[in-house]
Amino acid sequence: MFTMKKSLLLLFFLGMISLSLCEQERGADEDEGEVEEQIKRSIWEGIKNAGKGFLVSILDKVRCKVAGGCNP
């Protein structure tokens, strides 16, 4: 009976160790996903800001030509 308890206790601890290692690895994977998401978000923000600037400058030029007099 005593050896059976020892082996069950050993299996329990080994299972807990493997479970904690899996949780640590999963946490590392989630961190990588967050970094990738932040990179994608920053790239899209840059593209969006560049597009806004380009469109504003084009619209200013069109408005200037339609209205007539423009200040250089």
Curated annotation (Swiss-Prot):
One of its GO terms (cellular component) is extracellular region. Disulfide bonds join C64-C70. Antimicrobial peptide. Active against the Gram-positive bacteria S.aureus FDA209P (MIC=9.8 ug/ml) and B.subtilis ATCC 6633 (MIC>64 ug/ml), and the Gram-negative bacteria E.coli O111 (MIC=19.6 ug/ml) and E.coli ATCC 25922 (MIC=9.8 ug/ml). Not active against the fungus C.albicans. Residues 1-22 form the signal peptide. It comes from Sylvirana guentheri (Gunther's frog). The keyword Phosphoprotein does not apply. Residues 23-42 form a propeptide. Belongs to the frog skin active peptide (FSAP) family. Brevinin subfamily. Its main location: secreted. It is found in: Secreted. This is Brevinin-2GHc. Expressed by the skin glands. Keywords: Amphibian defense peptide, Antibiotic, Antimicrobial, Disulfide bond, Secreted, Signal. GO terms for biological process: defense response to bacterium; hemolysis in another organism. The keyword Ribonucleoprotein does not apply.
